[in-house]
A protein has these predicted regions:
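Metallo-beta-lactamase
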Residues: 1-123, 130, 139-197, 215-221, 241-265, ...
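Core dinuclear metal-dependent hydrolase active-site scaffold
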Residues: 2-5, 41, 47-53, 174-213
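Active-site metal-binding loops of divalent metal-dependent hydrolases
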Residues: 8-9, 63-66, 120, 200-202, ...
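Cap/insert and terminal regions of metallo-dependent hydrolase folds
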Residues: 67, 82-100, 213-334
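Conserved nucleotide-sugar donor-interacting segment of glycosyltransferase catalytic cores
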Residues: 125-135
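Generic beta-sheet signal
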Residues: 137-139, 271
């Protein structure tokens, strides 16, 4: 089995969306800051993951964004999202479009049999239009959230981005406990791809565990934006889901912490990691679809430099905002 990292665009986000959960970016106050803070932007990558499964064929985890989302905002978005999302929210080149990313590996979008969605947010479902024949798998709880609106007016799901799906596969997590998780879903019945419920970022958010030869890869979606978010008591994303969802988000990350302790060969692949972890390790190491022993050792060495005992960040590893240079709107997170 092989798994490839696909860089399918970038997105402009407020720094506080990624790192403000312990600094007042919570509840309605967090939503207000998310909508109004225009002076602390950072750019982060959007990734999808292509699995070449020996029996079940090509499997895509998340789909990224499409060309219209990035370049035709005013035509694509209507209603509340037209105003909530900035016109320059998404960045996408032709080389980053999902079909181009898949084709550079020698595959075609038409051959993708299964799509797993970690959740239904726009930067994860926009590319569904490129795989209209695939079966789309998502948590039943996420499907039930289709009609929900955050704070009563912001749609959790923009239906236009998912309307082309022909075959849905709702997941109810019926495969029993899996290490630190009370329930799971063995997607293909052979233990090779396990779906794990991680609500919090969204009601039906899930993670994808891919069991490789001698190690495991956990695709975290947005329950962990970056590897540093594993230290949930020190680094926390925006929390605007109410106390119940907020506690679910923290609990989901703690379950990932315990899973990491149970599976010593676990490699964590966060949803939007903009640090060296993504660009010096994950992207280049997954270019051939596998992680060699030497590459896994390099990843573990990086983790050792990042975390102290019990998963706390080492001094100096805490993120901070670097303001943009004069004349620019976007800074960076260091």
């Amino acid at each position: 089995m092989k798994i490839y990292s696909l860089h399918v665009g970038d997105t402009k986000v407020p720094y506080g969306q990624f790192y403000g959960g312990l600094a007042g970016w919570t509840g309605m106050r967090g939503m207000w800051r998310f909508a109004t803070d225009k002076s602390h932007y950072i750019i982060v990558p959007i990734h999808a993951y292509l699995i070449d499964h020996p029996q079940s064929g090509l499997v895509l985890v998340d789909t990224g964004i499409n060309w219209e989302q990035a370049h035709e905002h005013d035509r694509y978005y209507r209603g509340v999202l037209h105003y909530v999302l900035d016109a320059d929210e998404y960045l996408l080149t032709r080389e980053q479009e999902l079909p181009a990313q898949v084709e550079r590996l020698g595959y075609r979008c038409e051959d993708i049999r299964t799509v797993i969605l970690t959740h239904f947010h726009e930067d994860h479902v926009g590319g569904l239009r490129y795989v209209p024949e695939a079966k789309v798998v998502a948590a039943q709880a996420e499907w039930q959230a289709l009609k929900m609106k955050a704070f009563g007016f912001v749609p959790i799901v923009y239906r236009k981005s998912i309307e082309g799906v022909k075959v849905w596969g709702p997941v109810s997590f019926t495969s029993g406990p899996f290490h630190s998780f009370d329930t799971s879903q063995d997607l293909f019945g052979d233990g090779s791809v396990m779906l794990l419920p991680t609500p919090g970022h969204d009601p039906g958010h899930l993670c994808v565990l891919v069991r490789m030869d001698g190690y495991d890869i956990l695709i975290t979606g947005d329950i962990m934006y970056t590897l540093r978010h594993l230290a949930v008591d020190e680094v926390r994303a925006i929390l605007f889901g109410g106390k119940f969802l907020d506690q679910q988000q923290i609990d989901s990350i703690r379950r990932i912490q315990r899973l990491r302790q149970a599976l010593h060969g676990l490699v964590i692949v966060p949803g939007h990691d903009h640090t060296d972890y993504q660009y010096l390790f994950l992207e280049p190491f997954l270019a051939d679809g596998v992680l060699s022993l030497e590459e896994r050792e390099q990843i573990k060495a990086y983790e050792t430099r990042l975390f102290r005992d019990r998963g706390h960040l080492v001094p100096g590893a805490m993120p901070h905002f670097v303001p943009p240079v004069p004349g620019e709107r976007v800074g960076k997170a260091a």
